[in-house]
From Swiss-Prot:
This is Flagellar P-ring protein. It holds the Pfam family FlgI. It comes from Shewanella amazonensis (strain ATCC BAA-1098 / SB2B). NCBIfam families: PRK05303.1. One of its GO terms (molecular function) is structural molecule activity. One of its GO terms (biological process) is bacterial-type flagellum-dependent cell motility. The basal body constitutes a major portion of the flagellar organelle and consists of four rings (L,P,S, and M) mounted on a central rod.
Length: 363
């Protein structure tokens, strides 16, 4: 049976002209970014799907102490409706105190499900250790689990992870350097010297010579007004300037696990001939037992019977002419009906032979 290869090919650039992109689509302003927040909290109100770990009891006891309730030292709370969770959220740039964030709540321990639970007040901290938001509320859990007395279990999706829309209240803003200094720096999403130069040239065409300069393949620095309100208007104009990105370098990306192959536009092949075929050898071992009659006085003997089968697949050869393009390469690969492992071997051999002009990346 012929194994088909999933071959995804980037043909768009070959069929239509390269389209200019807005600066806001290919670059980001340095320093304008989101920040990750994380916290440790308790979910209560679970219908017996919580956990009884020691750290859960300790966290629960600490919470009671914060409310002024002290349990005797010899009393251990029996709780099955409580779970210890990790809470995390992304804090967008320029968000202000009083605004809200969506939070994700994930079970840390052995809780079976968070469905029906409520997150109690949880402090969300940044990497600097400061508290930036406080999360609390009822969760939305898409998954569920059910378990019978005989141990049978049904689980759909992930019942130990939930979300709370607008579940965190921002208490502190993250300081931003956006309005400081004489420059704004744009960082390209994909570093490329040609694209960086084209961006600087496009900005200079709009603002005047020497207003922008490419620092390297990923960064373009622009003189900007110092006044914050003027800088906002200035950036609103700049981010809509259109730039024609440079062509990507020639690459062939191969995912050996899924069999996906992505071939870039500029991949070329030098003259080469490839033979595709394979030898399959199958060895099967079967044990035969010779059992004598009860009164014969003989011994039981075990013998091995080996069956060896060899098959040679039909070999095919295809020839790449000088300057072979992406289309010919794709058609040739499909013609031989190569499996993913065979295609990878062919591409590696072409690269080693110097016939493949492009970077071969295996992921």
């Amino acid at each position: 049976m012929k194994i088909k290869v999933l071959l995804a090919v980037a043909l768009l650039a070959m069929t239509v002209p390269v389209k200019a992109e807005r600066i806001k689509d290919i670059a980001a302003v340095q320093g304008v970014r989101s920040n990750q927040l994380i916290g440790y909290g308790l979910v209560v109100g679970l219908p017996g799907t919580g956990e009884k770990a020691n750290y859960t009891e300790q966290t629960f006891t600490t919470m009671l102490k914060n409310f002024g309730i002290n349990l005797p030292t010899n009393v251990k709370p029996k709780i099955k409706n409580v779970a210890v969770v990790a809470v995390h959220a992304d804090m967008p740039p320029f968000i202000k105190p009083g605004q809200t964030l969506d939070v994700t709540v994930s079970s840390i321990g052995e809780a079976k499900s968070l469905r029906g639970g409520t997150l109690l007040q949880t402090f969300l901290k940044g990497v600097d250790g400061n508290i930036y938001a406080i999360a609390q509320g009822s969760m939305v859990v898409s998954g569920f689990s059910a378990e019978g007395l005989d141990g049978s279990k049904v689980i759909q999706n992930t019942p130990t992870v939930g979300r709370i829309p607008n579940g965190a209240l921002v208490e502190r803003a993250v300081p931003s350097a956006f309005a400081h200094g004489d420059f704004l720096t744009f960082n390209l999403h994909r570093a490329d010297f040609s694209t960086a130069k084209r961006m600087a040239d496009a900005i200079n065409d709009l603002l005047g010579p020497e207003m922008a300069r490419a620092l390297d393949a990923a960064s373009v620095q622009v003189y900007a007004p110092r006044d914050a309100s003027q800088r906002v208007s200035f950036l609103a104009t700049l981010e809509n300037v259109e730039v024609e990105p440079a062509d990507e370098s020639a690459k062939v990306i191969v995912n050996s696990r899924t069999g996906t192959i992505v071939v870039g536009q500029n991949v070329k092949l030098l003259p080469a001939a490839v033979t595709h075929g394979g030898l399959t050898v199958t060895i099967a071992e079967n044990q035969q037992v010779s059992q004598p009659n009860a009164l014969a006085g003989g011994d039981t003997v075990v013998t091995n019977q080996s069956t060896i089968d060899a098959s040679q697949a039909n070999s095919r050869m295809f020839l790449f002419n000088p300057g072979t393009s992406l289309d010919e390469l794709v058609r040739a690969v499909n013609l031989v009906g190569a499996a993913p492992s065979d295609v990878l071997a062919i591409l590696e051999a072409l690269k080693m032979a110097g016939a493949l002009h492009g970077e071969l990346i295996v992921i």
